[in-house]
Amino acid sequence: SGVYIYSYAFDNQQAADEASMVINCLSGHNPRLPVYYDLEDNSIIANGRQTGIASRAQVFCNRISAAGYEPGIYANLNWFNNILTDSVFKSSSWDHWIAQYNSQCDYTGNYSFWQYKSNGKIPGINGNVDMNYAYVDVSLYHWQLIDSTWYYAASNGKAYTGWLFQSGTWYWLEP
């Protein structure tokens, strides 16, 4: 499981408040997938606010990471190519989930998930559902016991190293 939040933050304080709300909701839970922050609302970039979008994303994602969860950014292809252009969106360790309703994803950066349609059908669910491809093994987002040693896999499938905060406990994971 993972988390998705649609942001309405106009400033850094509101981004921090959104992060706190997510962290409070996650208390006692350990999602395997990242906490995806959707910054696509036009109101948050209106009236010159676009210049602060990278700062708001950093505030949110840093708080999510400090609480022991993996942050990610969700947006459609147009936003990644034309709005989320600050280097923090390209060079950060934040996971990317791209929405592009097409037969292929044309995003040239790294991404783990591609939302390819919004009108999918699932038996037992009334109405349309979003359909996604995962380019990572989602089963890797958890603790693994390998040869009597515990590892925690990050979104890229590699063993996490350094300090990790999970379910209210800090762990030191050797490199």
Model-derived regions: residue spans:
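Short acidic, gly/pro-rich beta-turn/loop elements at beta-sheet edges
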Residues: 13, 47, 83, 108, ...
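Active-site beta-loop-alpha junctions enriched in small/polar residues
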Residues: 6-10, 40-42, 76-78, 101-103, ...
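Extracellular adhesion/carbohydrate-binding repeat motifs centered on closely spaced tryptophans
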Residues: 139-175
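Distinct, well-ordered alpha-helical segments
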Residues: 14-23, 80-90
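Aromatic-lined carbohydrate-recognition surfaces of secreted/lumenal glycan-active proteins
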Residues: 64-82
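Substrate-binding cleft of extracellular glycoside hydrolase catalytic domains
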Residues: 1-70
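Functionally critical loop-and-helix segments that line ligand-binding/catalytic clefts
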Residues: 87-139
